[in-house]
Amino acid sequence: MKIAVGCDHIVTYEKIAVVDYLKSQGHKVIDCGTYDNVRTHYPIFGKKVGEAVASGEAELGVVICGTGVGITNAVNKVPGIRSALVRDMTSAIYSKEELNANVIGFGGKIIGGLLMNDIIDAFLAAEYKPTEENKKWIEKMDSLQHASQDQNNPHFFDEFLEKWDRGEYHD
């Protein structure tokens, strides 16, 4: 599998460890940087990973910053990207199976390297399980990437709220 990986200067060493791990598992890696500890800005590298995945150059992506929050938000701004900030295998698997996430984000100063590798393995092994319901949710989420009058409609999510009221969703 070809995986794009990017980080900011705070977690360069953590990213290098992830790149080395992925290569040791037989994956091809597109290292989108950064490559040193010189101060930089996480949106640059979130965008690079997102563009690599959205264009098809990479199949999936991994982004890392100190907390994971900034770079995961940045990569989610790239059209075609569905990224999840994860700290456990359950969330990573859910993001892939139910939401068809194509990028996962980590807080490199929050989570240990061995756990990060385990979570990445779980994410890569998981497969999207399309259902009519999650297809609709993904379509609705993807529509938010493009400004439209529908988003200003206070009833934008009514079809889903009505199903909730009818008891069609189960936790």
From Swiss-Prot:
Gene3D superfamilies: Sugar-phosphate isomerase, RpiB/LacA/LacB (3.40.1400.10)
Enzyme class: isomerase
MF terms (GO), sorted A to Z: galactose-6-phosphate isomerase activity; ribose-5-phosphate isomerase activity
Range of residues in the leader sequence: none
Pfam families per UniProt: LacAB_rpiB (PF02502)
Keywords: Isomerase, Lactose metabolism
Reactions catalysed: aldehydo-D-galactose 6-phosphate = keto-D-tagatose 6-phosphate
GO biological process, one term: D-allose catabolic process
Keyword Iron appears in the UniProt entry: no
EC number: 5.3.1.26
InterPro entries in the cross-refs: LacB, RpiB_LacA_LacB, RpiB_LacA_LacB_sf
Protein's pathway: Carbohydrate metabolism; D-galactose 6-phosphate degradation; D-tagatose 6-phosphate from D-galactose 6-phosphate: step 1/1
Family: Belongs to the LacAB/RpiB family.
Subunit and partners: Heteromultimeric protein consisting of LacA and LacB.
Protein name: Galactose-6-phosphate isomerase subunit LacB 2
Gene source species: Streptococcus pyogenes serotype M1
